[in-house]
Amino acid sequence: MSMRTIAVTSAFLVAAVVVSAGTAGATPARPDHDPATGRFDQPHQGFAPAGTVLRDGTPQQAGLDPGPIDAAVAQLNGWTRDDPTTGHPLYSGQVTLLAHDGVIVTKEAAGYALRYADQQGGLLPTTEQIPMRTNTIFDLASLSKLFTSIVAMQQIQAGRLDVDATVASYLPQFASNGKGAITIEQLMTHTSGLPADPTPPLWQDPDMASRIDSILDTVPQFTPGSTYLYSDINMIALQLVLQKITGKTLDVLVRDGITRPLGMHDTMYNPPASLKPRIAAEEYEQGPGEPQRGLVWGQVHDENAWALGGVAGHAGVFSTVDDMAILAQTILNGGTYRGHRIMSEQTDAQMLTNLNQAFPGDAHGLGFELDQRWYMGRLDSTRTAGHTGFTGTTFVVDPVSRSFALQFSNRVHPSRNWGSTNPARRAAADGLANAMAVRAPGGVSWYSGIGDASTATLTTPAVTTTGEPVSVDYATFVDTEPGSDLVTLQSSTDGTTWSDVPVTATGPGAPTGTVTTLSGGARAWWRVHATLPATSGPLELRWRYVTDSLYTGRGVNVTGVRVSDASGPLFDGDRDQQAFTGTHWVLTDR
């Protein structure tokens, strides 16, 4: 195992050791006794207690505001109804499960697992339609990559696989066409330079042997390690390595190493026909350039996985939200659930540590995607992990708040061409993030609100300065899209012309030095100080929060505003809260 890989996990593990030191023989966690429960501004370090076991509860029992969760579920359910603009829903049906600190705070199903009679959206007779249920089984699509990666990490942990070794050292044929230098790590972080998909697709090859040769003889698109390119071929190649070193097929490795010990009884490749009524239907494949499969229902949707017999490193796993909740909590617990450990804390940490720092925006651990706001929404952070699946599945695990959001839809039923479901992916995570509290040190704060392409301002009353430099001090909580959604302190002597004020911030994750804008997602309160040049006459201050057209964080909170000069206090924002003028800003206690 790479010493470099071990080193990058050390900070995570130090925190994990502190957290887990007292958890031997622990009973299931009681989230209502944790002072950080329900808090968005109390980031956890390390893993949850190893004894944390999921239990059903209400948002209130987890310290959450039920309003944002109810609103998110209503929106997610609403997308199962026909849109007047498109004439069809965003997806046929969906199931959402949200959990915080070991409490499943909502689990809702809406729409249909089977609804359509053809690719154009003709409806089946009502008697043949199948409603979506919370125990519906979904084709996970690329969420399957997480299972392949966990199996690989188990083999690395056991010393049978070296993350720094070349793939060709296990599969000599893989060295063909200049691939000899590609490493196992590069497969797992999508930095191998391999193309996204096999060309031609594997189902066009005549037999299994030729399909395997197609993978092994792939021509790279880029030099290994030179770029990030998400590739299904990476995970299929990893599958072949795992099968070579263990002598077992991937489905057996997943069953024996993950699903059986964790009790994930509804998780499998190639589900039996007896389960078909519980499985969400998918696409009608009958167009040009597609295998003529008709309605894909109960078989893997991905054509390359189908060509590999339904068991593939990149796709093929079927599961429910309940089973995937167990996997999510296992990750949060440091690799264990109900006393069944599937990997060590160090191994778990390596899956959650960014190894792609050379490729900003494409953060990736050994298996998990990291810090992807486009589907992680307001749960996003540098430590938030997850994956999506083409069929409509979304898996987001946030160790910072010990929360996870699962949003599964059958978006490809009846056609893959009905549009993106990324708004739904974010909505589930946003609802959970918005339900958590941001509690100001003094009890209440001014809150910016949330919205794309919006501007919110919070303005002090005019104060009279005395010709001395003016000091401004306040506390702020900033959770915004880094570098894009910015909050700025501004000053004006006439109420019309505004100038940016340089500030310094202190606290976990605060920017270094003097800056004119604040953004990011440290999930911690910062103390902010600014000094304005000596001036005489009226002076107003305002906080201006501007968002771009896509993606927002939890927003901005401001409290404890103090304006003073050498003569003494000029304005105390806590004593005179109603003196502020807020446009889209509101007073809140959470």
Residue spans for each PLM region:
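A short, well-structured edge-of-sheet supersecondary motif
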Residues: 64, 76-131, 163, 202-204, ...
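Beta-sandwich/jellyroll recognition modules and their flexible linkers
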Residues: 70, 348-355, 372, 378-383, ...
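Short, conserved phosphate/pyrophosphate- and ester-handling motifs at nucleotide-, phospho-/glycolipid
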Residues: 65, 145, 320
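Secretory targeting and sorting signals
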Residues: 1-28
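Active-site SXXK
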Residues: 70, 74-80, 96, 102-110, ...
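Short, surface-exposed loop or secondary-structure junction motifs
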Residues: 34-50, 108, 113-115, 119-120, ...
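Short, glycine/proline-biased beta-turn/loop segments that scaffold the active-site neighborhood
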Residues: 162-178, 260-262
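Acidic/histidine-rich, surface-exposed loop or edge segments in extracytoplasmic proteins
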Residues: 49-61
